[in-house]
UniProtKB/Swiss-Prot annotation:
Region spans: Disordered: 671-703
A GO molecular-function descriptor: RNA binding
Organism: Arabidopsis thaliana
UniProt name for this protein: Pentatricopeptide repeat-containing protein At1g22830
Family: Belongs to the PPR family. PCMP-E subfamily.
PROSITE patterns in UniProt: PPR
Keywords associated with the record: Repeat
PPR repeat feature ranges: 82-116, 117-147, 148-182, 183-217, 218-248, 249-283, 284-318, 319-353, 356-386, 387-421, 422-452, 458-488, 489-523, 524-554, 560-594
GO biological process, alphabetically ordered: RNA modification
Region annotation (Type E motif) ranges: 595-671
Record keyword Repeat present: yes
Pfam families per UniProt: PPR, PPR_2
InterPro entries, per the entry: Pentatricopeptide_rpt, PPR_At4g14850-like_plant, TPR-like_helical_dom_sf
Length: 703
């Protein structure tokens, strides 16, 4: 009798050998009543036993069902009773995760000659697939002479569930070679496998087969095709499929909306959402989460926030995924007010209990990114049993706000609580040492990482080390870490390129960018910001212009506001003020105040009052800056051009901001002020040790 699921299937054995696997209880039952002695009442015995068997199966009484089956197979002369009973028992064994009885039953089926019956084969394939014995399941499928696609569908689906996508495609090809026609259940599975493998060529082959079949307009097949072409980035093909569909469900709409959000075409995604409502299909929480997630991925944080707020206004239940999306959006744009609204929803609702840890961690991150460390720590304190991820969230929050003393204190507290830092903890701390200029501590953590074998291939950690050294100006150390890495990704290269760019070594940065391309690593929008910034700092106008113009067509990266800002800085540093102004005319976004201030300062340096006054008006009237340095630049430009009425307006605004005297409109010298960076005011007292007694400070206690 087999003892473990690892035993191979019973094949290639003699009947006598197979009988060894059949339980003795099945062999010791009395022989069936002879035909000559049967009465009219005796003829109903098999039916009574079969009904009893079905009762045991329906009530989950597996072993009682097996005992009844033993009686049934000896008392019944009907082949179908035994066949369908065996099929039911195999399904029940799967439901109860009982491998040994199921394998014993398979042995009985082999000895009875039922192994390749069309009813039993799909059940056997399902049984072995459920125990991850996929090779055995495939052997049964291929040895059967059944021309129905059902067992093949089960096998393909099992390979996909086990992430063995290549094998699932191979099974499909084998199925086709046997002349078995795929059905509406086969195609969605193999399409999913092609998408997972990014096998565009064979995906098109499967699509071609569908086009000449009767399943061309099947709802589930079309939905799978749309998702596949989304994976391939072929939004236009997906849209044509969607438009020709005579029937659409919520999955269809979600799939096509997801296509546009993944390509950062959010305007079209919102149009489709409106069409979805007009067509009578109600947008589910999946639809909203798809759009919000796409907005986050595209960097459209205001759009993501609007999605979550829209869910609330449309009375759509906000689940944990939507709440986390909303809190992430608030974190990125500093929307503390909305973050507190979401916090109140968390307090009042019980729908987040199953994922409360992730929601709380997102709350801590949101408050930290909005520089409200007091409330971040309140949320942290109210967690009854802190997990490692919760410790990581609060430590990362204080590190982000450059509170080195509190970060060190929290790290010690975490160690005292019995938690050891993992790669996420260390990756969140390392950037702090570059920002506060405490590279010695960073080197100590570098040694800590080197001493632990478990961090040897942790890419995120080594990327953080490269970034720490690069941002500290220690480019040789950054390069040394880079060279020691066995695996690199776009983050690794981006950190190194940014480091060389900061030091004014634009040619070297471009050389590493080319090396990245040769290595087959595709850059993203952050990489392009680093490269353009390197060109700007090294006055590489021609190279920067080429990269900017070819970004979408050559690298497949959509131009973002940051890229336009880099080009304005590049042209301004080189004195090409006309080209810098042209950027404002072509940009599809609302220009930032930092971009206007960059052009304004360049005009003051180069004495171009014409473009300077235009930039000043744009800065004052359209972008409405909140940074003091920008107002000082405005005042200087209006003083130079003699625009006294506008100068008075600026002085009034400065007065409203509480500035009494500002060096008589002196130019601001620091780059950080020109770039519009927010200097976060830090309280000298430790946030951790502050009293938290007021009602406002205890937001988490408010209903």
């Amino acid at each position: 009798m087999p003892s473990s699921p690892s035993r191979s299937i019973l094949r290639g054995l003699t009947v006598s050998e197979i009988c060894k696997f059949i339980p003795q209880s099945w062999k010791q039952l009395p022989r069936p009543i002879s035909e000559t002695s049967k009465t009219h009442d005796d003829e109903s015995v098999p039916q009574v036993l079969f009904n009893s068997f079905r009762h045991c199966i329906s009530h989950g009484q597996l072993y009682e069902a097996f005992r009844t089956f033993s009686l049934l197979r000896y008392q019944s002369g009907s082949h179908e009773f035994v066949l369908y009973s065996s099929a039911s028992l195999l399904s029940t064994c799967v439901g109860f995760n009982e491998f040994v009885p199921g394998q014993q039953l398979h042995a009985h089926c082999i000895s009875s000659g039922l192994e390749f019956d069309s009813v039993l084969v799909p059940k056997l394939v399902t049984f072995y697939s459920a125990f991850n014995l996929l090779d055995e399941a495939q052997t049964i499928t291929e040895n059967s002479e059944i021309l129905h696609p059902l067992p093949w569908n089960v096998l393909i689906g099992s390979y996909i569930r086990n992430k063995r996508f290549q094998e699932s495609v191979s099974v499909y090809k084998r199925m086709m070679s046997k002349g078995i026609r795929a059905d509406e259940f086969t195609y969605p599975s193999v399409i999913k496998a092609c998408a997972a493998l990014l096998d565009f060529a064979y995906g098109r082959v499967v699509h071609g087969s569908i086009e000449v079949s009767s399943h061309r307009c099947n709802l589930y097949v079309c939905n799978a095709l749309i998702s596949m072409y989304k994976r391939f980035g072929k939004v236009d093909v997906a849209r044509r499929l969607f438009d020709r569909m005579s029937e659409r469900d919520a999955v269809s709409w979600n799939a096509i909306i997801n296509c546009y959000t993944s390509e950062e075409k959010l305007g079209e995604a919102f149009k489709l959402l409106d069409r979805m409502y007009l067509s009578g299909v109600e947008a589910s929480i999946v639809t909203w989460n798809t759009i919000a997630g796409g907005c986050l991925e595209a960097g459209n944080y205001i759009g993501a926030l609007n999605c979550v707020v829209g869910m609330r206004n449309c009375n759509v239940r906000i689940g944990s995924v939507a709440m986390i999306n909303g809190l992430k959006a608030c974190s990125h744009i500093g929307a503390l007010k909305w973050g507190k609204v979401f916090h109140c929803l968390v307090i009042r609702s019980c729908s987040f209990s199953h994922d409360i840890d992730n929601v709380r961690n997102s709350l801590i991150t949101m408050y930290s990114r909005c520089s409200d460390l007091r409330h971040a720590f309140i949320v942290f304190q109210q967690v009854e049993a802190n997990s490692l991820s919760t410790w990581n969230s609060i430590i990362s929050g204080f590190a982000y706000n450059e509170r080195s003393e509190e970060t060190s204190f929290l790290l010690k507290e975490m160690l005292l609580s019995g938690f050891h830092p993992n790669h996420i903890t260390l990756a969140s701390i390392l950037p702090l040492f570059a920002r506060v200029g405490n590279l010695q501590h960073g080197k100590e953590f570098h040694c800590y990482i080197l001493r632990r074998q478990s961090y040897k291939d942790c890419l995120i950690l080594w990327n953080s080390l490269v970034d720490m050294y690069a941002k500290s100006g220690e480019i040789i150390a950054a390069k040394r870490v880079f060279d020691s890495m066995r695996k690199r990704d776009k983050v690794t290269y981006t950190s190194l390129i940014d480091g060389y760019g900061r030091l004014g070594k634009g040619e070297v940065a471009l050389a590493w960018f080319k090396d990245m391309d040769r290595s087959g690593i595709k850059p993203d929008h952050v990489t392009m910001v680093a490269v353009l910034s390197a060109c700007s700092h090294s006055n590489l106008v021609r190279e920067g212009h080429w990269l900017f113009t070819k970004m979408e067509h050559v690298f497949g990266i959509r131009l973002r506001l940051e890229h336009y800002s880099c080009m304005v800085d590049l042209y301004c540093r080189a004195g090409y003020l006309d080209k810098a102004r042209d950027i404002f005319h072509t940009i599809p976004y609302e220009p930032s105040s930092a971009m206007c201030a960059t052009l304004l300062k360049a005009c003051l340096i180069h004495g171009n009052t014409n473009i300077g006054e235009w930039a000043a008006d744009k800065l004052l009237l359209e972008t409405k800056p909140e940074h003091l340095g920008h107002y000082m630049l405005l005042a200087d430009m209006y003083a130079v051009t003699g625009s006294w009425s506008k100068l008075v307006t600026v002085k009034t605004l400065l007065s409203d901001l509480g500035v009494q005297k500002a060096h008589e409109f002196a130019l601001m010298e620091t780059d950080s002020e020109l770039d519009g960076e927010n200097n976060k005011p830090m309280n000298d007292d430790s946030v951790i040790n502050q009293e938290q007694s007021s009602d406002e400070e205890r937001l988490v206690e408010v209903g």
